Amino acid sequence: MNKHDREVMAAFFAQVDENGISNAEKVETRHHVIRRIETTSKDKSYEDASETIDNRAEGLPIGVVEVDGKLVGLGIHIPNEDVYPLQSFEIYLRGCDLVGNLDISGCSDLVFVDLYRNRISSIDAANMPSLRILGLQSNQITALDPTEMPACQGIDIGMNRLESIDVSRNPELVELYVNDNCLTSLDTSHNAKLKYLRVQNNAITDLDTTGNPLLRHLYATGNPLVRIRALAPGGEGHQPLELTAEEGGFVGLSFNPIYNAQWKETGEWEQSYHAYPDDGFLFVGWYDESGKCVSEELDWMDEYGASRVLQANFVQVVCSSSLV
Protein backbone atom coordinates (compact mmCIF):
# COMPACT_ATOMS: atom_id res chain seq x y z
CA MET A 1 0.00 0.00 0.00
CA ASN A 2 1.37 3.42 -0.84
CA LYS A 3 2.25 5.95 1.85
CA HIS A 4 -0.70 8.25 1.15
CA ASP A 5 -3.31 5.50 1.47
CA ARG A 6 -1.73 4.11 4.65
CA GLU A 7 -1.74 7.56 6.24
CA VAL A 8 -5.38 8.11 5.23
CA MET A 9 -6.44 4.82 6.83
CA ALA A 10 -4.40 5.46 9.97
CA ALA A 11 -5.95 8.92 10.37
CA PHE A 12 -9.50 7.57 10.07
CA PHE A 13 -9.00 4.86 12.66
CA ALA A 14 -7.18 7.25 15.04
CA GLN A 15 -10.28 9.45 15.44
CA VAL A 16 -11.95 9.23 18.85
CA ASP A 17 -15.51 9.60 20.06
CA GLU A 18 -16.90 11.70 22.92
CA ASN A 19 -15.55 9.14 25.40
CA GLY A 20 -12.05 9.12 23.98
CA ILE A 21 -12.40 5.68 22.37
CA SER A 22 -10.72 5.42 18.98
CA ASN A 23 -12.18 3.86 15.88
CA ALA A 24 -9.33 1.33 15.92
CA GLU A 25 -10.24 0.22 19.44
CA LYS A 26 -13.88 -0.17 18.45
CA VAL A 27 -13.00 -2.34 15.48
CA GLU A 28 -11.00 -4.72 17.66
CA THR A 29 -13.91 -5.24 20.07
CA ARG A 30 -16.98 -4.78 17.85
CA HIS A 31 -16.17 -6.10 14.39
CA HIS A 32 -18.34 -8.93 13.14
CA VAL A 33 -17.51 -10.64 9.87
CA ILE A 34 -20.27 -11.82 7.56
CA ARG A 35 -19.80 -13.34 4.16
CA ARG A 36 -21.35 -15.05 1.19
CA ILE A 37 -19.32 -17.69 -0.57
CA GLU A 38 -20.06 -20.56 -2.93
CA THR A 39 -21.02 -22.90 -0.06
CA THR A 40 -23.38 -20.44 1.69
CA SER A 41 -26.88 -21.90 2.04
CA LYS A 42 -29.13 -20.63 -0.76
CA ASP A 43 -31.82 -19.62 1.74
CA LYS A 44 -29.48 -17.16 3.48
CA SER A 45 -28.25 -13.75 2.39
CA TYR A 46 -24.99 -14.34 4.25
CA GLU A 47 -23.36 -16.42 6.97
CA ASP A 48 -21.14 -15.63 9.94
CA ALA A 49 -17.46 -16.12 9.20
CA SER A 50 -15.15 -17.65 11.79
CA GLU A 51 -12.18 -17.27 9.44
CA THR A 52 -11.57 -14.51 6.93
CA ILE A 53 -9.75 -14.17 3.65
CA ASP A 54 -6.12 -13.27 4.30
CA ASN A 55 -6.16 -9.68 3.06
CA ARG A 56 -5.65 -7.54 6.16
CA ALA A 57 -3.22 -4.69 5.63
CA GLU A 58 -0.26 -5.00 7.98
CA GLY A 59 -0.41 -2.61 10.92
CA LEU A 60 -4.02 -1.56 10.25
CA PRO A 61 -7.35 -2.84 11.64
CA ILE A 62 -9.34 -5.64 10.08
CA GLY A 63 -11.50 -4.33 7.26
CA VAL A 64 -8.68 -2.49 5.51
CA VAL A 65 -8.30 -4.72 2.47
CA GLU A 66 -4.98 -4.85 0.64
CA VAL A 67 -4.49 -6.87 -2.55
CA ASP A 68 -1.23 -6.93 -4.52
CA GLY A 69 0.09 -4.05 -2.46
CA LYS A 70 -2.91 -1.82 -3.15
CA LEU A 71 -5.72 -0.54 -0.92
CA VAL A 72 -8.81 -1.93 -2.67
CA GLY A 73 -11.43 -2.18 0.07
CA LEU A 74 -12.58 -0.51 3.27
CA GLY A 75 -15.06 -2.55 5.28
CA ILE A 76 -15.65 -5.02 2.46
CA HIS A 77 -13.81 -7.44 0.21
CA ILE A 78 -15.29 -8.67 -3.07
CA PRO A 79 -12.79 -11.29 -4.27
CA ASN A 80 -13.52 -11.25 -7.99
CA GLU A 81 -14.80 -7.65 -8.18
CA ASP A 82 -17.95 -9.03 -9.83
CA VAL A 83 -20.55 -6.55 -8.62
CA TYR A 84 -23.61 -7.36 -10.75
CA PRO A 85 -24.80 -9.82 -9.72
CA LEU A 86 -22.81 -9.93 -6.48
CA GLN A 87 -21.83 -13.55 -5.86
CA SER A 88 -19.38 -13.46 -2.96
CA PHE A 89 -18.15 -10.98 -0.37
CA GLU A 90 -16.84 -10.46 3.14
CA ILE A 91 -18.08 -7.51 5.22
CA TYR A 92 -16.29 -6.41 8.38
CA LEU A 93 -17.16 -2.99 9.80
CA ARG A 94 -20.94 -2.62 9.92
CA GLY A 95 -22.32 -1.37 13.22
CA CYS A 96 -18.93 -0.67 14.83
CA ASP A 97 -19.87 2.85 16.04
CA LEU A 98 -17.11 4.42 13.93
CA VAL A 99 -17.10 8.23 14.13
CA GLY A 100 -15.65 11.34 12.54
CA ASN A 101 -14.71 12.36 9.03
CA LEU A 102 -14.09 9.74 6.37
CA ASP A 103 -11.47 11.37 4.14
CA ILE A 104 -10.60 8.89 1.39
CA SER A 105 -9.69 11.54 -1.18
CA GLY A 106 -6.81 10.54 -3.39
CA CYS A 107 -7.07 6.82 -2.61
CA SER A 108 -6.95 6.13 -6.31
CA ASP A 109 -6.89 2.31 -6.04
CA LEU A 110 -9.83 2.03 -3.64
CA VAL A 111 -12.68 0.11 -5.26
CA PHE A 112 -15.19 -0.76 -2.51
CA VAL A 113 -16.35 0.97 0.70
CA ASP A 114 -18.89 -0.53 3.13
CA LEU A 115 -19.38 1.27 6.45
CA TYR A 116 -23.10 0.82 7.13
CA ARG A 117 -24.62 1.64 10.53
CA ASN A 118 -21.91 3.79 12.04
CA ARG A 119 -21.74 7.45 13.17
CA ILE A 120 -19.61 8.94 10.41
CA SER A 121 -20.46 12.64 10.12
CA SER A 122 -18.75 13.66 6.86
CA ILE A 123 -16.95 12.28 3.81
CA ASP A 124 -14.41 13.59 1.33
CA ALA A 125 -14.24 11.45 -1.82
CA ALA A 126 -12.30 13.67 -4.23
CA ASN A 127 -10.07 12.10 -6.89
CA MET A 128 -11.50 8.56 -6.67
CA PRO A 129 -11.11 7.16 -10.21
CA SER A 130 -11.46 3.47 -9.26
CA LEU A 131 -14.27 3.58 -6.70
CA ARG A 132 -17.18 1.41 -7.82
CA ILE A 133 -19.26 0.89 -4.67
CA LEU A 134 -19.82 3.42 -1.85
CA GLY A 135 -21.95 2.05 0.98
CA LEU A 136 -22.61 4.49 3.85
CA GLN A 137 -26.18 3.70 4.82
CA SER A 138 -27.26 4.71 8.34
CA ASN A 139 -24.65 7.27 9.34
CA GLN A 140 -24.90 11.00 10.14
CA ILE A 141 -23.64 12.45 6.86
CA THR A 142 -25.01 15.83 5.76
CA ALA A 143 -23.27 16.17 2.38
CA LEU A 144 -21.74 13.97 -0.32
CA ASP A 145 -19.99 15.16 -3.48
CA PRO A 146 -19.68 12.17 -5.84
CA THR A 147 -18.57 14.18 -8.87
CA GLU A 148 -15.00 12.81 -8.77
CA MET A 149 -16.12 9.16 -8.69
CA PRO A 150 -16.61 8.63 -12.46
CA ALA A 151 -16.49 4.80 -12.34
CA CYS A 152 -18.93 4.46 -9.46
CA GLN A 153 -21.71 1.94 -10.10
CA GLY A 154 -23.40 1.92 -6.71
CA ILE A 155 -24.07 4.58 -4.07
CA ASP A 156 -25.99 3.74 -0.90
CA ILE A 157 -26.25 6.86 1.25
CA GLY A 158 -29.71 6.08 2.60
CA MET A 159 -30.70 6.95 6.17
CA ASN A 160 -28.42 9.95 6.52
CA ARG A 161 -29.04 13.73 6.56
CA LEU A 162 -28.48 14.81 2.96
CA GLU A 163 -30.35 17.86 1.67
CA SER A 164 -29.05 17.47 -1.90
CA ILE A 165 -26.89 15.26 -4.11
CA ASP A 166 -25.52 15.79 -7.63
CA VAL A 167 -25.05 12.56 -9.62
CA SER A 168 -24.82 14.22 -13.03
CA ARG A 169 -21.17 13.17 -13.38
CA ASN A 170 -21.69 9.51 -12.52
CA PRO A 171 -22.58 7.96 -15.90
CA GLU A 172 -21.84 4.38 -14.77
CA LEU A 173 -24.32 4.48 -11.89
CA VAL A 174 -26.51 1.36 -11.70
CA GLU A 175 -27.71 1.61 -8.10
CA LEU A 176 -28.65 4.78 -6.20
CA TYR A 177 -30.15 4.55 -2.72
CA VAL A 178 -30.86 7.96 -1.16
CA ASN A 179 -33.91 6.98 0.88
CA ASP A 180 -34.66 8.47 4.30
CA ASN A 181 -32.80 11.74 3.88
CA CYS A 182 -33.92 15.38 3.53
CA LEU A 183 -33.84 15.71 -0.27
CA THR A 184 -36.26 18.13 -1.92
CA SER A 185 -35.29 17.16 -5.49
CA LEU A 186 -33.28 14.59 -7.43
CA ASP A 187 -32.01 14.73 -11.02
CA THR A 188 -31.15 11.36 -12.59
CA SER A 189 -31.32 12.50 -16.21
CA HIS A 190 -27.58 11.83 -16.72
CA ASN A 191 -27.70 8.25 -15.40
CA ALA A 192 -28.83 6.21 -18.40
CA LYS A 193 -27.57 2.93 -16.87
CA LEU A 194 -29.55 3.30 -13.64
CA LYS A 195 -31.53 0.17 -12.73
CA TYR A 196 -32.17 0.49 -8.99
CA LEU A 197 -33.42 3.68 -7.31
CA ARG A 198 -34.67 4.20 -3.77
CA VAL A 199 -35.88 7.71 -2.91
CA GLN A 200 -38.56 6.92 -0.34
CA ASN A 201 -39.09 9.08 2.74
CA ASN A 202 -37.64 12.38 1.57
CA ALA A 203 -39.25 15.77 0.83
CA ILE A 204 -39.37 15.49 -2.97
CA THR A 205 -42.38 17.06 -4.72
CA ASP A 206 -41.64 16.22 -8.38
CA LEU A 207 -39.73 13.20 -9.72
CA ASP A 208 -38.80 12.48 -13.33
CA THR A 209 -37.08 9.18 -14.21
CA THR A 210 -37.82 9.21 -17.94
CA GLY A 211 -34.08 9.53 -18.56
CA ASN A 212 -33.58 6.08 -17.00
CA PRO A 213 -34.95 3.58 -19.56
CA LEU A 214 -33.34 0.58 -17.79
CA LEU A 215 -34.94 1.33 -14.42
CA ARG A 216 -36.55 -1.83 -13.04
CA HIS A 217 -36.54 -1.25 -9.28
CA LEU A 218 -38.03 1.99 -7.93
CA TYR A 219 -39.24 3.00 -4.48
CA ALA A 220 -40.69 6.52 -4.57
CA THR A 221 -43.06 6.45 -1.61
CA GLY A 222 -43.39 8.56 1.51
CA ASN A 223 -42.68 11.88 -0.26
CA PRO A 224 -44.98 14.90 -0.82
CA LEU A 225 -44.99 14.08 -4.54
CA VAL A 226 -47.56 15.81 -6.71
CA ARG A 227 -46.13 14.39 -9.94
CA ILE A 228 -44.09 11.35 -10.95
CA ARG A 229 -42.98 10.85 -14.55
CA ALA A 230 -41.49 7.42 -15.24
CA LEU A 231 -41.33 4.74 -17.90
CA ALA A 232 -43.17 1.45 -17.57
CA PRO A 233 -40.60 -1.12 -16.42
CA GLY A 234 -39.74 -3.85 -18.88
CA GLY A 235 -40.95 -1.79 -21.84
CA GLU A 236 -37.51 -0.78 -23.13
CA GLY A 237 -38.23 2.82 -22.22
CA HIS A 238 -41.05 3.36 -24.69
CA GLN A 239 -44.23 3.41 -22.58
CA PRO A 240 -45.17 6.18 -20.11
CA LEU A 241 -46.03 5.64 -16.46
CA GLU A 242 -47.19 8.91 -14.93
CA LEU A 243 -48.94 9.78 -11.68
CA THR A 244 -50.24 13.17 -10.58
CA ALA A 245 -52.08 14.27 -7.47
CA GLU A 246 -54.96 16.70 -7.42
CA GLU A 247 -55.28 19.13 -4.51
CA GLY A 248 -55.64 17.34 -1.22
CA GLY A 249 -52.90 14.73 -1.29
CA PHE A 250 -49.79 13.19 -2.76
CA VAL A 251 -48.78 10.13 -4.76
CA GLY A 252 -46.13 7.42 -4.62
CA LEU A 253 -44.87 4.76 -7.03
CA SER A 254 -43.03 1.49 -6.56
CA PHE A 255 -42.07 -1.31 -8.91
CA ASN A 256 -39.54 -4.08 -8.56
CA PRO A 257 -38.74 -7.74 -9.13
CA ILE A 258 -39.28 -10.10 -6.20
CA TYR A 259 -35.95 -11.33 -4.86
CA ASN A 260 -34.88 -14.40 -2.94
CA ALA A 261 -32.63 -14.40 0.14
CA GLN A 262 -29.51 -13.88 -1.96
CA TRP A 263 -30.93 -10.91 -3.87
CA LYS A 264 -31.56 -12.92 -7.01
CA GLU A 265 -34.73 -12.42 -9.01
CA THR A 266 -37.43 -15.06 -8.62
CA GLY A 267 -39.25 -14.23 -11.84
CA GLU A 268 -42.14 -12.51 -10.01
CA TRP A 269 -42.73 -8.76 -10.08
CA GLU A 270 -44.65 -5.98 -8.35
CA GLN A 271 -45.92 -2.57 -9.50
CA SER A 272 -47.94 -0.40 -7.12
CA TYR A 273 -49.41 3.10 -6.89
CA HIS A 274 -49.90 4.85 -3.56
CA ALA A 275 -52.16 7.75 -2.60
CA TYR A 276 -51.66 9.85 0.54
CA PRO A 277 -54.58 12.14 1.51
CA ASP A 278 -53.83 15.33 3.42
CA ASP A 279 -55.49 15.88 6.77
CA GLY A 280 -59.10 16.77 6.15
CA PHE A 281 -59.23 15.02 2.77
CA LEU A 282 -60.33 11.59 1.56
CA PHE A 283 -58.99 9.66 -1.41
CA VAL A 284 -61.63 9.21 -4.12
CA GLY A 285 -59.81 7.07 -6.67
CA TRP A 286 -57.35 6.71 -9.53
CA TYR A 287 -58.60 8.24 -12.79
CA ASP A 288 -57.21 7.60 -16.27
CA GLU A 289 -56.88 10.08 -19.14
CA SER A 290 -60.49 9.57 -20.18
CA GLY A 291 -61.73 10.54 -16.72
CA LYS A 292 -62.71 7.00 -15.80
CA CYS A 293 -62.10 5.78 -12.25
CA VAL A 294 -60.01 2.62 -12.63
CA SER A 295 -59.39 1.89 -8.94
CA GLU A 296 -60.47 3.14 -5.53
CA GLU A 297 -57.60 1.47 -3.66
CA LEU A 298 -55.21 3.72 -1.76
CA ASP A 299 -52.44 1.23 -2.47
CA TRP A 300 -53.20 -0.32 -5.83
CA MET A 301 -51.09 -3.23 -7.06
CA ASP A 302 -51.17 -3.25 -10.84
CA GLU A 303 -49.73 -5.61 -13.43
CA TYR A 304 -45.97 -5.22 -13.68
CA GLY A 305 -44.99 -3.30 -16.79
CA ALA A 306 -48.39 -1.63 -17.19
CA SER A 307 -48.28 1.74 -18.93
CA ARG A 308 -50.66 4.25 -17.37
CA VAL A 309 -51.29 7.96 -16.99
CA LEU A 310 -53.20 8.33 -13.73
CA GLN A 311 -54.53 11.09 -11.53
CA ALA A 312 -55.21 10.64 -7.83
CA ASN A 313 -58.33 12.56 -6.82
CA PHE A 314 -59.17 13.68 -3.30
CA VAL A 315 -62.19 15.33 -1.72
CA GLN A 316 -62.30 17.60 1.28
CA VAL A 317 -64.21 16.34 4.27
CA VAL A 318 -66.92 18.81 5.25
CA CYS A 319 -67.79 18.69 8.91
CA SER A 320 -71.31 19.83 9.71
CA SER A 321 -72.18 21.32 13.06
CA SER A 322 -75.47 22.18 14.65
CA LEU A 323 -76.44 24.48 17.46
CA VAL A 324 -78.37 22.98 20.33
Residue ranges and their predicted role:
Residues 1-100, 108, 224-250, 256, ...:
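N-terminal capping/linker segments that flank leucine-rich repeat
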Residues 71, 86-88, 99, 110, ...:
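Conserved hydrophobic position(s) of the canonical leucine-rich repeat
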Residues 270-296:
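Surface-exposed interfaces of beta-sheet-rich extracellular modules
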